[in-house]
Amino acid sequence: MKRTNVILTFFALSTFALLTAQGIHAQQAAYTLKATPKTVAWGYYDAKAAPVLRIKSGDTVQIDTLITNSPKRLEAAGVPPEQVEQSLRDITEQVKDKGPGGHILTGPIYIEGAEIGDVLEVKILAIKLAIPYAYNAFGPGRGYLPDDYPYAKMKIIPLDAQRMIANFAPGIEIPLHPFF
């Protein structure tokens, strides 16, 4: 399921504690990190990847995330073309370095002052659905039962952002409550 426009606040706890202890009140900033061909990794995060955004402890970041599927497959499954995000089209066409996983990951984000071994606190302040659908899919040789299904299938699941539910099937509504 796609959740987007996640607003996060990052805290480098050791740095935050140090600044507070010294009575320094750093000015907090707010950023927006869009999912673009230059700000995503497809299928993996490389520890050597350069950060696409640098922030300080206490800063707020609104992060756009994307559904992990191709526009062609989504449209073939019944998603109207106007509901497929342009950023997904751009990333699908332009990102050539794709790892073994299927997920499109926005980032990485570098937190100034954070060091190896630090504990980072991330607060998710809000989640807003960017598209009115999710999907579930399987294919041969994939998933938990790779040998049981020699064919592929994808189900588009309509989302109701007002009620925060997924209309999985007639009479089956799944609440869209985050796990945190």
Please report, for each region that a protein language model flagged, where it lies by residue.
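Short, Lys/Arg- and Gly-enriched loop/turn segments at beta-strand edges
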Residues: 68-80, 127-137
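Boundary at the C-terminal end of the N-terminal hydrophobic targeting segment
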Residues: 21-28
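A generic structural signal for residues embedded in beta-strands
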Residues: 63, 119-122
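Bacterial N-terminal signal peptides
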Residues: 9-20
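Intrinsically disordered, low-complexity linker/loop segments enriched in Gly/Pro
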Residues: 103-104, 126-180
